[in-house]
Each structure stands twice: as structure tokens, then as C-alpha cells.
């Protein structure tokens, strides 16, 4: 066992082998492991794609087609990378919703939650700048629309936009800096993920019952490693269906048209995993108000440890909260649908109602429901 006591090996052993894990965690706890698999896949495929990609407005689109047609298994690398981004967001969104359901944001794991929200923000930034790189119509116009939102910042907004673009429009300088940042950001996400894991293991994992128990725990290996690998096999099958049978179903057909600044697409939409936030942005007619609401929709998650008022972690014992939780999930799905629809009625009104409920849930319902539950428990109602 002297081998295990070596510094690097002991870290791996403490966090992945002998790590004490609650015996009652189920497959909802698989998604942290799956998100790390997605990140590794994205980094590896991204490195190989970068070897053949050219970050120049005249060559970017052609270099992507070169990867698809001429590079050995280039089509596979690209489809794994593009669909891998979607899989990454699916896994992370489920991971977040699981945390909301089982109260993973409640102390002592509140800093784990805050770091997780930071990872989500970094993922959104990375995915956005990555969407620009193929230099199709949706890449160019999506970049133009989203970066233009910064101009809503009073006094300095226009200067920041010019600085982001590296000129007076989305052009070669923009593409170069986006490529550079897109290559760097996954490694930043990996570093922050290690911090996320280290802080989690300081206080230990939660469990479906939401109780702290240092007695009913077993080592992570082999019990939960085997469970994680079973989840990974199911995930790979699901992932492979998209890669091999429907590789473009989650993309936009306009991005197979080379970027043309003289022709505006009929309907500019971001990737599907941004649609709920995009719907919140469009729900407010005022530009600065919409941008503030969109940013707040993400930032508010980081403040949940200080907003909630309940003493019960798990929703298994909170029937009243559970009802409002599932309404919130429905609103998120509705916002995702509305984000892909034209800006016209009734879509605008539906988006506004769903956006209002989203914020009411976090700002009003979370603290109020906790106090109502406390009152009902005290009087045994």
C-alpha cells in the first residue's frame, strides 16, 4: 500500500476510490460524473479539430468543410464535438435541477453550488464563442446580435462592443479572438471543476433524504464507480443516436450557408440550450431591461443559499414546494420553446408570463414556502 501513499496517487485515491459516499444515492447523482466525461470529450475532440481549423473569415467555413470531407474521420470529430456540447448542457441542466429538487444549495454545500453556477456561466460563454467559429450565417448574425447587447450598458456600452469586435463590425479580428478564447476556456472550466469537486468532498455528498450521516457510507469504489459506468453506457448510447443518425437535428440549417454580412437571416436564433435565456431577454421590450433580466436569470441561482428559508433539504418531504418546483420546470421548458419562436403574439405574452413566474419562484416562493412549511410543522398541521 506504499504506492497509494504517494502524493499524487493519494489525491486520486482519496477523491475517487476511498471517498465515503452515502449508501442511498441513486442515478440522479450520476450526472456530475457524466458532465466530467462530456468535458473530457469536448477538450479532446476540440484539440484535434483545432489542428485543421483556420480562424480567418475567408477560410473558416471552407476549413470546416475540409474537416468534414477530407480529414480522416473529421466528420465524426465534428459531430461528436457539436452534439457533445448539447449533451454537456443536457447533463448539466439535469444536474442543476437535481440540486434544486434535493436542496444541494443549502449549507454546508453552498459554496459547491456557487462554484457550480460559475461553471455554468463559463460553459455558456464558451459555447457562444464556439458557435461563431464555423462562420455560417447563424454564426455571424448570432455573434452580431448577442455582442450588440453589451451596447445596452450606459455610457461605455458602445466602446466595449468595439473592443469586443476588434473593429466596427464582427470580422476577422473577432473570429481570431473568439477562436483563441474558445480553445482556452475549456481548460479554465476543468480547473474550476476540480475546485468544485474539492469543495464538495470537504463536506461530503448529499443524499435523497437530505440528512447528514457519517455512519451509512461506503467507499466510492467499486459500488458507485460501477453505477456511474452503467449510467455512462446508457449516456453513450443516447449520445451515439444523435452523432450517427441525427447529427444536425440540434443545429440550425442556416449555419450550413457561408456567412454573408449583406444578407440577414429571416429568423436569428441561438443554439437550443440558450433559448430559455433568450426568451427572457426578448420578453422585456427595453434593451437594457432585457439584458439585465437575462443575466439575472443565471446570477440568481448563485444567491439561492441565502434566499431560501427552509430547514428541510429534500423535496421528498416538501409536497407544497414540490408542486411549485414542477411548475418552474414547466416554465423553463416553455421558455425554451418560446425562444425559438418569432417575436409576435401569442409567443411574446406566453414568454412574459413564464419569465415572471421564473423570477417569482426564486425571489418570492422559495423564502415564503420555507416559512409556511415551518409554520405548518410547528403547529403540526
Swiss-Prot record:
It holds the Pfam family Cytochrom_B_C. The chain crosses the membrane at residues 31-51, 75-97, 112-132, 178-198, 224-244, 288-308, 320-340, 347-367. The lineage of its organism: Eukaryota, Rhodophyta, Florideophyceae, Rhodymeniophycidae, Gigartinales. The gene is MT-CYB. This is Cytochrome b. Keywords: Electron transport, Heme, Iron, Membrane, Metal-binding, Mitochondrion, Mitochondrion inner membrane, Respiratory chain, Transmembrane, Transmembrane helix, Transport, Ubiquinone. Belongs to the cytochrome b family. It comes from Chondrus crispus (Carrageen Irish moss). Heme b b566 binds at residues 95, 196. GO terms for biological process: mitochondrial electron transport, ubiquinol to cytochrome c. It comes from the Eukaryota. The main subunits of complex b-c1 are: cytochrome b, cytochrome c1 and the Rieske protein. Its main location: mitochondrion. Its cofactor is heme b. Heme b b562 binds at residues 81, 182. PANTHER family: CYTOCHROME B (PTHR19271:SF16). Heme 1 (or BL or b562) is low-potential and absorbs at about 562 nm, and heme 2 (or BH or b566) is high-potential and absorbs at about 566 nm. GO terms for cellular component: mitochondrial inner membrane; respiratory chain complex III. It is a multi-pass membrane protein.
Amino acid at each position: 500500500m506504499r504506492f497509494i501513499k504517494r502524493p499524487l496517487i493519494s489525491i486520486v485515491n482519496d477523491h475517487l476510490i476511498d471517498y465515503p459516499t452515502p449508501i442511498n444515492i441513486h442515478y440522479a447523482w450520476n450526472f456530475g460524473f457524466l458532465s466530467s466525461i462530456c468535458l473530457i470529450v469536448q477538450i479532446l475532440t476540440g484539440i484535434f479539430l483545432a489542428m485543421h481549423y483556420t480562424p480567418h473569415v475567408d477560410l473558416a467555413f471552407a476549413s470546416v468543410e475540409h474537416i468534414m470531407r477530407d480529414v480522416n474521420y473529421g466528420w465524426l470529430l465534428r459531430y461528436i464535438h457539436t452534439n457533445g456540447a448539447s449533451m454537456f448542457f443536457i447533463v448539466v441542466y439535469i444536474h442543476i435541477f437535481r440540486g434544486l429538487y434535493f436542496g444541494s444549495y443549502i449549507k454546508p454545500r453552498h459554496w459547491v453550488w456557487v462554484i457550480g453556477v460559475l461553471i455554468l456561466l463559463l460553459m455558456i460563454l464558451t459555447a457562444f464563442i464556439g458557435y461563431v467559429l464555423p462562420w455560417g450565417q447563424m454564426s455571424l448574425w448570432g455573434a452580431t446580435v448577442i455582442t450588440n447587447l453589451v451596447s445596452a450598458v450606459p455610457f461605455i456600452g458602445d466602446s466595449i462592443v468595439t473592443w469586443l469586435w476588434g473593429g466596427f463590425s464582427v470580422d476577422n479580428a473577432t473570429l481570431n479572438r473568439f477562436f483563441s478564447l474558445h480553445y482556452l476556456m475549456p481548460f479554465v472550466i476543468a480547473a474550476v471543476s476540480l475546485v468544485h469537486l474539492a469543495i464538495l468532498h470537504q463536506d461530503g455528498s448529499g443524499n435523497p433524504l437530505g440528512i447528514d450521516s457519517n455512519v451509512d457510507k461506503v467507499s466510492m469504489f467499486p459500488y458507485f464507480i460501477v453505477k456511474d459506468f452503467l449510467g455512462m453506457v446508457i449516456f453513450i448510447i443516447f449520445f451515439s443516436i444523435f452523432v450517427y443518425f441525427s447529427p444536425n437535428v440540434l443545429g440550425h440549417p442556416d449555419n450550413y450557408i457561408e456567412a454573408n454580412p449583406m444578407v440577414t437571416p429571416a429568423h436569428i436564433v441561438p443554439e437550443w440550450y440558450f433559448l430559455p435565456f433568450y426568451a427572457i431577454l426578448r420578453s422585456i421590450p427595453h434593451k437594457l431591461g432585457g439584458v439585465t433580466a437575462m443575466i439575472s436569470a443565471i446570477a440568481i441561482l448563485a444567491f439561492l443559499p441565502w434566499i431560501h428559508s427552509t430547514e428541510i433539504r429534500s423535496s421528498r418531504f416538501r409536497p407544497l414546494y414540490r408542486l411549485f418546483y414542477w411548475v418552474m420546470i414547466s416554465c423553463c421548458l416553455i421558455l425554451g420553446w418560446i425562444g425559438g419562436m418569432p417575436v409576435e403574439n401569442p409567443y411574446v405574452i406566453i414568454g412574459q408570463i413564464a419569465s415572471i413566474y421564473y423570477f417569482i419562484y426564486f425571489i418570492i416562493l422559495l423564502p415564503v414556502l420555507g416559512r409556511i412549511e415551518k409554520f405548518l410543522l410547528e403547529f403540526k398541521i
